[in-house]
């Protein structure tokens, strides 16, 4: 069956369902597509199609993720749903599925459970900006007082982890009733999508952020100077603009005197472009892979940070043994490896393969970084973990 082509005229938002196992994340995902299909905003996707999520590799880690897309009156959404808890942990830490917002699914019959807490905490750690709650399975609860109690618990839990628990929209409904085509089931799905439309903020587009380009290669072109190449991560660079070279050494200022793409000269390079940038007065040996070009003052180099990390299991090709305090692997940021030392918190003796953990890292050289930056942990050239910078300590 040919895929319906979506008009890209509406603003795009990436979203995902999170929450405890068996609380109805996949049923809800299916219900959204089935309800929106009635107005032509989606291709109806059955539970089984979503549940049989294909495996993907992201930074050497295998993750099962299902992707569906749909649109409301106002927006176009790409929605991710994961079959297993471990897939969520990996997904959120590696940023395999970037989430601009999340739908937290909580079963009204059970209330918040351990993974509900863990997913809220992870969402906070990795910087998911906002979430909306779907209180599912209300057809299994007869007592309105119980519903109210569960709602209060969810709000308290959200507040505890730094989300605005009092403001977050909580929609009550039953994904099952929506799948069965019952009017009250469909009404709840429409209410949920209205809440997602209005409450999840529109993400800032990459081109509107400050200019940043990780340096992949450096050449010197006789008579013209030094050219650095890479893919522009964010923002726009125009010929004649002043830029900084950040990371590994002291920050240097320089000027962009040319932007080249596919051997053609351009006036500017923007997010997503693979470009060569000619730098005025910069010597070949002053720049290296692993540094970044950036808008002056927009990013600083740091060597100490806190991170949320997923450690690969033995089956995933990771370590066979746990690591302890003062473990010294390589940290791969953007385009280069830097050695660093891991400091575990006082209450943690070791980290087991297959676990996720929070710890502090001290690098031997500073890297241009901001909160939310993703990295891999490598040992002898193989990936043993993936992480995200949650806090910079300097």
UniProtKB/Swiss-Prot annotation:
Keywords: Cytoplasm, Elongation factor, GTP-binding, Hydrolase, Magnesium, Metal-binding, Nucleotide-binding, Protein biosynthesis. Residues 81-84 are annotated as: G3. Residues 19-26 are annotated as: G1. It is an enzyme of class 3 (hydrolase). Its EC number is 3.6.5.3. Residues 10-204 form the tr-type G domain. Residues 174-176 are annotated as: G5. It comes from the Bacteria. The keyword Translocase does not apply. It catalyses: GTP + H2O = GDP + phosphate + H(+). Mg(2+) binds at residue 26. Gene3D superfamilies: P-loop containing nucleotide triphosphate hydrolases, Translation factors. Residues 60-64 are annotated as: G2. PROSITE patterns: G_TR_1, G_TR_2. GO terms for molecular function: GTP binding; GTPase activity; guanosine tetraphosphate binding; translation elongation factor activity. GTP binds at residues 19-26, 81-85, 136-139. GO terms for cellular component: cytoplasm. Residues 136-139 are annotated as: G4. GTP hydrolase that promotes the GTP-dependent binding of aminoacyl-tRNA to the A-site of ribosomes during protein biosynthesis. Belongs to the TRAFAC class translation factor GTPase superfamily. Classic translation factor GTPase family. EF-Tu/EF-1A subfamily. HAMAP family: EF_Tu_B (MF_00118_B). Monomer. This is Elongation factor Tu. The gene is tuf.
